[in-house]
Amino acid sequence: MNKIADFNDLPFSPKKLAFSSEGYSLQFFCPENPDIVLDSISDSDYNKDQFLPYWAQHWPSAQQFLSYILQYPFKTDIEVCELGCGLGVLSTAFMIRKCKTFSIDISHHACRYSHQNIMLNGCIPKVLCSDWRNIGLNKRFDLIAASDIIYESRWVEPVLSCMNSMLLPDGKAWIADPCRRYWDPFKMRAKELGFILRTLKYEKVTEKKMEIEILELSRGKNRLLNQVLY
């Protein structure tokens, strides 16, 4: 276990979260008050890209996804990329399951939290602060994973384009979502572009009054997948 555990250098007054899932006990830090993270964004910075700090919370979809990852029988040496890694929870789970994992987020604050949280759980982080509209990573992966990233319509095309460019020919993408407004349009567009969709897990979370789906996307034979999507 890495001894860097006090996290005094992290911004936004971090608090500790502890999870027990599938026989694993994990710890993570997150901002104590997400509203403070939101308030830290200046009007000028917001107007540049209308970025909101969704990364600052551990969402129910990610919790369901965490359990799924921890029990999945992965092959050895699989290479994974998590888009929108946020707090690094899913990346940590993949690393615990011996997957070679890259973690990517547009927020440098999220990347700091992800980096430290991965180390806290005894893993070696590979974190890149980048935008999925232009990743700048010349590498392809066996699996691309993400949770709670289709929260705006403008992300549908860039996310699909990013997955297409970063997946190996026989690679797959796993995305978890609480069936928000743009989830069905995302799935429809993915089908139009030739992705094959399969539901890995679907669950109603009564106490949260939401439905969570973990979706797998793989390539079909549609030639559209070799084209630029936006």
Question: Each PLM stretch: what is its role?
Answer:
Residues 1-230:
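S-adenosylmethionine-dependent methyltransferases
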